[in-house]
Amino acid sequence: MTAYTLETLIDREAIRDCLYLYCRGIDRLDEKALRAAYWPDATDSHGAYKGSAAGFIDMALVKLQQAGRMVHQISNVLIELHGNEAAVESYFTAYQEEKDTNGQAIETMLCGRY
């Protein structure tokens, strides 16, 4: 078992908060929460998108305006701290509602890793 210092526990909780902020931000299209989840110079490799986190947020906020309900959930968060850097892996489950070109509802369940 790893012995944690107060500082490492605080760091780990801050990382978890970023994951939760992302989920809340994307589900509610909350730009402030989304931007708070990333460093200003962060990059994102998110499905077909690969580029700056700011670019991903801008794209997602426009694309998802027409989406219905979204629910992102995080689990199995593994955080490895290495000095001033961290390696983080988490699993997600996401439910999304959209409409096809005929206006019919499409429900999608996604699972993966962040």
Show which residues each predicted segment covers.
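Short, low-complexity N-terminal intrinsically disordered segments enriched in polar/charged residues
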Residues: 1-28, 32-40
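Conserved aromatic-histidine-acidic binding/catalytic patches
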Residues: 7-10, 102, 106
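Conserved helix-adjacent loop modules within structured domains
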Residues: 105-114
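Short, hydrophobic/aromatic alpha-helical segments in well-folded domains
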Residues: 18-21, 75, 113-114
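A solvent-exposed, acidic/Ser-Thr-rich amphipathic alpha-helical stretch
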Residues: 31-99, 106
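Soluble or luminal CAZymes and related metallo-dependent hydrolases
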Residues: 14, 71, 110
